[in-house]
Amino acid sequence: MCLQNLLSILCFVLAISFGYVSAQKCVDSMFFRPNGTYDTNRHLILSNLASNVSSRDGYYNGSVGEGPDRIYALGLCIPGTDPKVCDDCMQIASTGILQNCPNQTDSYDWRSQKTLCFVRYSNSSFFNKMDLEPTMVIGDLNSGLFQGDLAAYTRTWEEFMNSMITRVGRTRYLADISPRIGSARIYALMQCIRGISSMECETCIRDNVRMYQSCCNGFIGGTIRKPVCFFRWDGSEYLGAFGDTPSLPPPSPDGKTISTGAIVAVVVSVVIFVVLLALVLVIRKRRQSYKTLKPKTDDDMTSPQSLQFDFMTLEAATDKFSRNNKLGKGGFGEVYKGMLPNETEVAVKRLSSNSGQGTQEFKNEVVIVAKLQHKNLVRLLGFCLERDEQILVYEFVPNKSLNYFLFGNKQKHLLDPTKKSQLDWKRRYNIIGGITRGLLYLHQDSRLTIIHRDIKASNILLDADMNPKIADFGMARNFRVDQTEDNTRRVVGTFGYMPPEYVTHGQFSTKSDVYSFGVLILEIVCGKKNSSFYKIDDSGGNLVTHVWRLWNNDSPLDLIDPAIEESCDNDKVIRCIHIGLLCVQETPVDRPEMSTIFQMLTNSSITLPVPRPPGFFFRNRSNLDPLTYGSELGQSSSKSIPYTIDSASITRVTPR
């Protein structure tokens, strides 16, 4: 027994000693080149992490850079921390990681410095990832072993910790005080990062508790830290985490219970507090009700005050929504150029009153876009819900849409050769790459898995440098982390860009966006709309069929837009056509993920698989059976045979 205790003490002291040498955990599995792009990005994101965390209620995650030089970082402070104290703690933790982990691609630190804060960075996204290793055990050398009835202490310790474990998952944070053990108490704090589930939080904390029981049983204080959770226990208060926790009175010497008067006083105080709290909440709700939509489901919008614009400001910015400021028609409404009082140019999207499902699309767009931050996505600046108006305010993107440059002015039926000539092969290739990065962010790197469901040329805006920005999230759907596909009774989007499983069965997933992106790649290469190919040959009339024929005839270069013939790289063009055909394969499982597409575009040494036949491939118009074809598109057999997917009609939704 003595030997076992001695080994436990030795184990704990060694762990503590190591912990005091370095509070940071530098993961030594991968390294980066000092002073390179990754190192620059690391300094950039960590130097701004403290201000981002302290200004965002104590929690922030984000990324900087592209490709292999991209770095992800997360920071948090425990709830209720003063912003200045949080900022100081984050500064110390960030600086410590930079100094003590000179070239590791993954490091983390739980810092106890007046408060508890956490910093982690990595070369791969970890925001929703359950990481239980590596572990740090750090303790208080001065606390020592519990002096008293060790069996009673251990029993109380285990019961108390198990009780906390069952509660911590709901909020990811818990600080509590145990019942008395003689004159002693246990002060325990548990914290998980927000990205993991409640069950994962409980699992991580439980693993820390087991580690204490196996190596450090009986010690009064210490901490056990993992990349996604933190556990500390001690014999006295710390970090100001227990200031609001009421202290229980010591047991009465004569063993009598608390007096009736004391109980009545406590009950009356609690009742008064609850009544006052209810009154405050009712008054606040009434004051703010005119600014928010009445919630109907759990998915309805919750709107931060900083995003709200008043109607008069937007009316003045757009000169009362004058025709001269009209930029065009977007999904479910008209878009106007505006100038805010601070001289910021904006695009103001005014939802039309007869837009059918517009209200839901409006809320959908606000909820989703407000959470997204990526250079290849149009940034949402705010919204307005006054006077029965529903308005979205976006950053202004000066060069209109990709559709305008590739296919011309739809209203005037004109194609300006000077506009098309601005899209040389280098720019088109960069546009394909930018859209890839934007979709990769939506599908994989954002906090939610988001499916756009309406990827097409008119929803790709071009900034002043002709960089693409994905726009119009009215059709978008967000998925849980563990969800891979869904279905809908109402098929929405643009025909010609929809995959077969969506058109016929209403099933959609990230592979739906991949299919649409494949069609868009082929349009960018050839400079023609998908719907313009029904006159070219005897096929059923779409771009996918035309490209598949050229591919099988070993003549893919016949697809190239004459405007880029002299400037294009034939190898890259063929590779893009190949990737486009992989994206439009009939079976979703055959289509590559956006992460794979990104690798295919950036690494020419990757061998591409042979594409399978695409969806909506028609051999000859005369072979089409009206009944079969109509039913495949989800139409009544009484409908006439559509020659293009763009002209098909499944619902009364007007293609945008």
UniProtKB/Swiss-Prot annotation:
Annotated signal peptide: 1-23
Domain Protein kinase spans what residues? 321-606
Q: Which residues are glycosylated?
A: N35, N52, N61, N103, N123
Task: Please list the residues that carry the modification Phosphotyrosine.
Answer: Y394, Y502
Provide the primary localization. membrane
Keywords linked to the UniProt accession: ATP-binding, Glycoprotein, Kinase, Membrane, Nucleotide-binding, Phosphoprotein, Receptor, Repeat, Serine/threonine-protein kinase, Signal, Transferase, Transmembrane, Transmembrane helix
**Would you say which domain of life the source belongs to?**
Eukaryota
Query: Cytoplasmic topology: which positions?
Result: 284-656
GO-annotated cellular components: membrane
Query: Which residue ranges run through the membrane?
Result: 263-283
Q: Where in the cell is it found?
A: Membrane
Q: Per the UniProt record, which EC number(s) apply here?
A: 2.7.11.-
Residue ranges in the Extracellular topological domain are 24-262
Q: Which residues carry this modification: Phosphothreonine?
A: T494
Active site per UniProt: D454
Kindly indicate whether the keyword Secreted belongs to this entry. Answer: no
The UniProt record lists the Gnk2-homologous domain at 24-126, 134-238
Q: What's a single GO MF annotation on this record?
A: protein serine kinase activity
Q: What class of enzyme is it?
A: transferase
Family per UniProt? Belongs to the protein kinase superfamily. Ser/Thr protein kinase family. CRK subfamily.
Protein name per the record: Putative cysteine-rich receptor-like protein kinase 32
What is the scientific name of the source organism?
Arabidopsis thaliana (Mouse-ear cress)
